[in-house]
């Protein structure tokens, strides 16, 4: 039993009731009703100094209310006293940002935005942070891979707050009983899967475009040609990797969909790939198998030089500043403060104390990660995978990439199409959309190259 709060007070006198009169109750109810038209329920906090409130930096937090409240508290406690910059913090859903920006009612700074910074940058709606003189020193706080998706036309339009990537989880007890070791490569995983299958067990590998792209990077294949004018999924190397990827599900019986947490817990799926945040979830939700499983870097691809490339894809949530802000310098000061190790460490400690270990904050700041609650052995394994991260650089029309790679996968696995034919068909569709979007934004296309 955990006691959160304890209150001591004098013994109350029972039988005494305090009731407001009719007119007081009526006046209070009317006041509540009228206030419902003017109260901003999204507002978490405003500038402490009323004289500065009209000049307050407007910050939207696209996360839960608990997270927004912590941002507000840290801002009032640390940022405003040090800089003198008043800040108004609102808890607003990320889905509201686009419509508010179009209407000219958007914020100055957006915290915990989705990985959509590129789309705002492409439409000149995001402020280029790399134009600030001290940007390089601020960007050095992060792994290079976490900045890739925040770049457009040579400029950076956001800074990462959180960094996520996948790792491998395996049951040490089950593999030991079967005389197996954790796989280092995909080929080793395939060999292990046959033994597991004979024992009515399976392997959990996400059947998504991201898994294919990850394997593509591990094998040394390029995704784009001519600086993003078109994709290279129809090359021999890319098709070979795609064939290997689809064979996981066609030939080796890997499940297409599954609930990893419970299957891993029961032992039905003793090996699987999931975001490294799964580590905390398993420790909380499956205490009966504590000490019987481990987390390790992803299986990789054995290269010609004898080294194993186990690149994982990095996913970030970012902080950005909108281009129509009237307070760019103040906004930059806030972003620098918020992405610094002190603020990130404080936020991580606060959020874990409120929501528990399963909600541990995965800060993109390298120093804040070192300050986190992970123990030494856990940090060592995570850092090993962090040293092999990459990301897909966003391009105009990039939304078509994941969609059509998944369509190509379905056409092979569900409809029996040839991997080669599927990749030729859907690569053509992707490249056509790339050309269309590049024309829309006045960029060079494949057709221009042909001329």
Language-model segments: which ranges?
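Extracytoplasmic "Venus flytrap"/periplasmic binding protein-like
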Residues: 77-145, 151, 173-181, 270-271, ...
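Short helix-initiation/N-cap motifs at beta->coil->alpha
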Residues: 90-99, 186-191, 254-266
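Extracytoplasmic/periplasmic solute-binding protein
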Residues: 152-161, 166, 188-239, 269-271, ...
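Glycine-centered hinge/linker elements that transmit conformational signals in sensory
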Residues: 228-257, 301
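Extracytoplasmic/periplasmic substrate-recognition and gating elements
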Residues: 251, 286-358, 387-390
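Long, aromatic- and glycine/proline-rich binding clefts that accommodate carbohydrate-like moieties
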Residues: 298-300, 349-411, 439-451
